[in-house]
Amino acid sequence: MSQHELDIASSPGDVRPWIRYISSVKNDKTTARQKCILFERAVTALPRSYKLWKEYLDFRSGLCTGLNPIKHADEYDRVNALYEKSLVLLHKMPVIWLQYLQFLMLQPKVTKTRSVINEALRSLPVQQHPRVLKLALQFGTKVGGPTSVQIWKRYVLAYPDQKETMAQSLIKMGYHGEAAVVLIELLNASGDNYALWTELVDLIGESDKLTLEPPVEQIISSGIKRFPDQRGPLTVQLANFLVRNGDLESARDVFEDGITTANTVRDFTVVFDAYAEFEERIVTHLIENESPMADLRIAKLDHLLERRPFLISDVRLRREPYSVLEWQKRIALYEDPAETVAAYTEAVQSIPPAKADGKLSQLWISWAKFYAEDRETACEIYHKATLVPYKSVSELADVYLAWSQYESENDHWENAVKIIKQALESPNTHVSYHNSDLTAQDRIHKSVRLWSYYADLVESYGTFEETKQVYEKIMALDLLTPLFVVNYATLLEENDHFEEMFKVYEKGISLFEESAFEIWNLYLVKASPRLGLERLRDLFEDAISKFPTQKALYILYGKLEEDRGLVRNAMRVYSAMCDHVKTSETFKYYIGRTVENFGLAATRPVYDKALESLPNKDASELALDYAQMEEKLGEIDRARAIYGYGSQFSDPQIIKYYDAWHKFEVAHGTEDTFKDMLRIKRSIQAQFNTDIHYATTAAEVKKGTVQEFVKGETVQKGNIEPPVAQANEDEIELDI
């Protein structure tokens, strides 16, 4: 007897001798049959030993590895029997149940496997069910059919978060009804999950017959309420479901409801296009079958297409019920006069003036214009329009202006004037135009636009005195504007009331600081031919003191002095202009007037002043003109000195200046003066190139980020000495 047998005999209730015995024969030459006998002895001796049964079952299952479960069904059945035998006493051991299920899944025994799954779930505690169910789910996925459905139902009880996966699996297996039920449960639990709704609706759309609780119609209707932004696609899905189920009239009702209740053009377009396609298919079917109903359906389809622009208008008006623009678009759709009038009536009744989006007055005006050929009705509408409590005075003014213009165009100018006059009459003249607590009707008499039109109207059809009274009323109401000043002054001028005209200009100047210069300009132009010199001088001095940088005032003042023969006074004015407005244009104008009155030579002091005052770029330009002027006068040395002096303002990149100097030296210079020119040019070039500040500033000027380079920031006046000319007793030294 072997030692293992002795150990077992000495310790019959101990599992360890059996384990050692079994381990010793695992890798020796003992046959499988002999090993099985040993395992049988062991589990018979200790039937409750999990270790022994686990070793035995692993060994017997391993013997089936690679064997075809159909050809060797007997061998598989014997192993199955062993599992059953072990579970009699070890039914609380989840590992054995799981191992048994995995072994069964290798065999074509669907019913047996389902039975074992149920037994495992009954035998094991609830905490162990998920392990069994995961394995069962693999089995269900493998076999499919009702078995898979039932397993999924059991599985999601343990894993409720896997319901969406269950729905996907059921859809793949073709169980649309069961999948829809799962999706409905998910939607009821999760609320507004649009992805699930889309999945459910698509599922319904793919199923010709689907009985659900709640019904499909109710489900999709619920989706429309939950997801109003998807109203269009969901409505089409519902209608298509009804069509597939043969309920065409109900589908048509759904389409009609969809196009008449859509809140966006996008939803409307989706539903309308599907509706039209649905009707076209019906018409095609009826025509192919020569049905007598074909003509009726064609007529209904045509009517549907004709309704489209009106239905779109309905959609827009549902979104913007107080939009004047949308109501105008709606009215434009009608061709029948009666329908147009009805639309206008509906529009003005539907828009509360305080909530109007846009100018409600334009709606009333266009309605009145609709009756342009019926003066009595048009005037009645205009009158009603003037009673509407508009949000702004401007809208009420639009109505009065349109009404008056209508009467004027129809040669009823007296009525045109009367309409505006009545609008502008008010017992309370002290109200504020901007007081929104008052109605537009209470403030209309302060409308500048209406007064302006009234003044033009009275001027066209009334007398001078009547027009004058209008302007005086405007002034009394403190409604004067710069335009009123100019118009009133022009009216007085045309009727030879010059002193009153001057007073109007002066009042405008005192009231409008921002526009005072323009008014001064007109005032001085009008006053120059009519007032004495001393008074005019006072006016000009006053204007210039207020606007010292306005070149036009100096030019006008200087011209006055010249016209009166006081040329030297004019020159003083031009000199003052150059003191206050330091630009090349002002100096050129001053130089031009000096040349005309005193000749070229007299311009030297002006040029000197310009070179002292102007920034580099302008100084360079004037220096060139100055030198060329001296050249014309034959003053060659003076011209050369000016070229040299002006070079400090002139970047050598300014080709014009140095080209002129070059030509001058070629024409009048010597070799020495030419060399001096080149030396100065090189010196200036070096100065401009090495001045870092200049280089940086020039780059920024090129980009437009800073002002241009000005004299005094780089090369200072006098830094470069003019070239020394040849000894000449007539040489003139410039003190510039």
Curated annotation (Swiss-Prot):
Annotated GO biological process: generation of catalytic spliceosome for first transesterification step; mRNA splicing, via spliceosome
Localisation per UniProt entry: Nucleus
Assigned GO CC terms: post-mRNA release spliceosomal complex; Prp19 complex; U2-type catalytic step 2 spliceosome
InterPro entries according to UniProt: HAT, HAT_Syf1-like_N, HAT_Syf1_central, HAT_Syf1_CNRKL1_C, Syf1-like, TPR-like_helical_dom_sf
Pfam families per the UniProt record, alphabetical: HAT_Syf1_CNRKL1_C, HAT_Syf1_CNRKL1_N, HAT_Syf1_M
SMART domains on file: HAT
Keywords: mRNA processing, mRNA splicing, Nucleus, Repeat, Spliceosome
Top-level taxon of origin: Eukaryota
HAT repeats mapped onto the chain: 1-27, 30-62, 74-106, 130-161, 246-281, 339-373, 377-409, 428-460, 462-494, 496-529, 531-563, 598-632, 634-667
SUPFAM superfamilies registered for this protein in UniProt: TPR-like (SSF48452)
Function statement: Involved in pre-mRNA splicing and cell cycle progression.
Similarity comment: family membership: Belongs to the crooked-neck family.
Subunit structure: Associated with the spliceosome.
The protein's name: Pre-mRNA-splicing factor SYF1
